[in-house]
């Protein structure tokens, strides 16, 4: 009797030492444990009870299946599997082997029964717990004192686990979300300032208040790498980012403390703006890069201490990252480069700062060096890359064109357009500016080069047709408009111009 009880507590302690988490363990003869990752079971139940008849096994298995189903539903898991181990002095008197060999299935829950019999102790232990040393359970341990000592050792392990969980829970008490709420208030305030000064969707207003604008950054307005994180384009953009910052920022600030959170948030905002500066020529604004930096900080915790992460936060944060990235790639006009840059910046900033009392100074220093090297390297590339310099020129020219400053556009782009590798976008904006000031021959030459680079650009063929018709080169005009109609047959203005050119040829 005492040997079986001794074995029961020894097995429980063995499982805890093997990474199992105690869910329930009191004065009763029942212990529930959560299995570590990559185990064949999700849960293990140790049940010390003398079985008389097989029907007791059947009834108990069905009851445990219902309990596991409730747990599965609460945790939102797709499936759960329980290893249900009976510790019984004797086996049931009737036919029980068939029950013990068959896994009980009920919907998305499965229960695998097993018996450890006092009369077949070593054989059963070897079958159910092959990693357990059966030599530790011999007749010399069959005493009340040894059983109590084994029980006390197990309970001490339970207390140790509880202390560890309290320590992990204390991670969320390192700071109050002061800066999170401050940034939320600041971005709401800035939104109203934008609205009363021209509108938050007005590009000129956004740029005036500090939006990321590549040409101005290249001219030395470095503060534009930081100021976009408090500006938002429209009420929907503000609402989405405010909700995201409230849900993610509060968790990060509680984990890392307010000081570390501030540095992570600002570093992520800057790296997000740098990535946008390098990969996107368009003006941009928003806290998305900094918010993705918060996700990066949580991702760092997930990778550096996976068990604590799963117990305190869970896998939902990974789902949030995937959903946000997927949403960004699926919807047009989303600055994904800024999102990814912020995610990377937040990750390395978190690794450099670490959680409070984290230690590991060497790794943190390396992370800080990597963060700075990445930021400086990409910024240097953005400032000196020919393609990026051209993108900045195109953006600047587009703004001048919208303001009606066509001659300034030609002055800005003529030198770049003379290069053989000038992009189609640059050639097209210079061409339409030349059209506005009457430089038709120059515009024709530019558009002819543009359609060679982008042969499916129907708008350029249409503009070419207009220019050829203006110069009375009707054969060329007809050929150009036919190509435009072929590329976009439903465009009515193309068809109208085609009819006009054909009529002029006939007359």
Curated annotation (Swiss-Prot):
* Activity regulation info: Inhibited by dichloroisocoumarin (DCI) and N-p-tosyl-L-phenylalanine chloromethyl ketone (TPCK), but not by other serine protease inhibitors such as sulfonyl fluoride PMSF and 4-(2-aminoethyl)benzenesulfonyl fluoride (AEBSF).
Q: Which GO terms describe its molecular function?
A: serine-type endopeptidase activity
Annotated consequence of substituting residue 286 to A: Loss of protease activity
Q: How does activity depend on temperature?
A: Is more active at more active at 25 degrees Celsius than at 37 degrees Celsius.
| EC number(s) given by UniProt | 3.4.21.105
Q: Where are the TPR repeats?
A: 424-457, 458-491
Cell compartments where the protein resides: Cell membrane
Q: Main location per UniProt?
A: membrane
Enzyme group, top EC level?
A: hydrolase
Catalytic activity line of the entry: Cleaves type-1 transmembrane domains using a catalytic dyad composed of serine and histidine that are contributed by different transmembrane domains
Q: Can you tell me which family this protein belongs to?
A: Belongs to the peptidase S54 family.
Q: What does this protein do, in the record's words?
A: Rhomboid-type serine protease that catalyzes intramembrane proteolysis. Important for normal cell division and sporulation. May act as a glucose exporter.
What name does the UniProt record give this protein?
Answer: Rhomboid protease GluP
Q: Which organism is it from?
A: Bacillus subtilis (strain 168)
Gene that codes for this? gluP
